[in-house]
């Protein structure tokens, strides 16, 4: 309810953090155009259930180590230096995909982008292993909803492009 309160105006972020040193944090940013925010608003306006289905933040923080994490910038600048003039993933995403006025092109482009990042990520990388654990959890949550009788045609999962192809297959 707080996220869709009239008192809370985007942009805003939810921050999860550890309580013991060294302090680690995760930020979940929300802008007016954020798919997650729009999904929450839609669910509220249409009296539908809306649930987060990622791993709990304390588990994610437990899996992460700052020194071991691959940065988004490294993926594009080191793996694909000649494929893009962008120097970071956020800039590439914003200028190449986010500003598309064609929804089909946006969906196709974001799917291709996510699959390309997955393909270029080393399967032994700790962040990839962490993401695989997260995706397995998300799949399990979706299966639980299906087992509870939720219609598969009425389940919508909002994920980042990197996770979409992994989540689409419930195997």
Where are the regions a protein language model picked out?
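Compositional signal for N-terminal targeting/processing segments
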Residues: 1-171
């Amino acid at each position: 309810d707080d996220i869709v309160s009239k008192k809370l105006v985007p942009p805003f972020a939810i921050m999860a953090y550890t309580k013991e040193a060294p302090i680690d944090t995760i930020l979940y940013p929300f802008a007016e155009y954020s798919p997650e925010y729009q999904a929450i608003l839609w669910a509220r306006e249409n009296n539908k259930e809306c649930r987060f289905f990622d791993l709990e933040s304390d588990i994610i923080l437990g899996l992460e180590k700052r020194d071991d994490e691959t940065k988004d910038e490294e993926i594009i600048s080191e793996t694909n230096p000649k494929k893009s003039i962008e120097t970071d993933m956020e800039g590439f995403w914003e200028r190449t995909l986010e500003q598309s006025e064609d929804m089909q092109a946006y969906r196709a482009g974001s799917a291709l982008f996510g699959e390309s990042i997955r393909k270029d990520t080393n399967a032994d990388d700790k962040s990839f292993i962490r993401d695989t654990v997260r995706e397995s959890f998300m799949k399990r949550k979706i299966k639980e909803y299906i087992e509870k009788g939720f219609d598969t045609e009425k389940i919508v999962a909002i994920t980042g492009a990197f996770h979409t192809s992994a989540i689409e297959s419930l195997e």
